Design a protein with these regions (language model features):
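Mg2+-dependent endonuclease catalytic cores in nucleic-acid-processing enzymes, primarily RNase H-like
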Residues: 1-114, 155-160
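Acidic two-metal-ion nuclease catalytic site recognized across multiple nuclease folds
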Residues: 5-9, 106-160
């Protein structure tokens, strides 16, 4: 996982332009780009056809989770615990990511009958003193790990 674009504040238009340039420069297909449908990314899908919108409150793939965001967060935790993810970033980004990962906690840990969920973003903000933007990004990236992109069947020679 690379953090290729990192800005403190961006307008919707600058995000669109930066994403287009990044996809061209790094040859990232639109099908491998995910944006937060609840944030500034909510309008991007209409301008960048084919990108994935992340709706964290949507129904999870696996019904043992509260919602899609929780399922992705648990997948992130699994990959981290199994040392199966690497993030290429600056030292400052690393420090912030470590801080934000510290607030990735399971909610309702005592309840045996409840679905698995994570503490709310508001609780995370209260603990951190800022929005967990890097954590959100990492959680959204797990969409591709829990929901693989369907592979198109390859056409055989002579067939259309």
């Amino acid at each position: 996982c690379y953090i290729r674009l990192d800005q403190e504040y961006s307008t919707g238009k600058s995000i669109e332009t930066d994403l287009k340039n990044m996809m061209i420069q790094w040859k990232i297909p639109r099908s491998m780009m995910v944006v937060d449908s609840d944030g500034l990314g909510s309008y991007l899908e209409s301008y960048l056809n084919g990108i994935k919108e992340f709706h964290g409150g949507n129904r999870p793939i696996n019904p043992e989770y509260d919602n899609l965001k929780s399922e992705c967060a648990f997948k992130l935790a699994e990959l981290i615990n199994n040392r199966q993810i690497r993030i290429i970033c600056t030292e400052a980004q690393r420090e912030r990511i470590m801080e934000e990962l510290s607030v990735l906690k399971q909610d309702h840990i005592d309840a045996d009958t409840r679905k698995k969920g994570i503490i709310s973003k508001e609780n995370m903000k209260d603990i951190l003193g800022h929005s967990p933007d890097y954590l959100d990004m990492l959680i959204m990236a797990m969409l591709f790990r829990i929901k693989p992109i369907p592979k198109r069947p390859k056409a055989k020679l002579g067939q259309i």
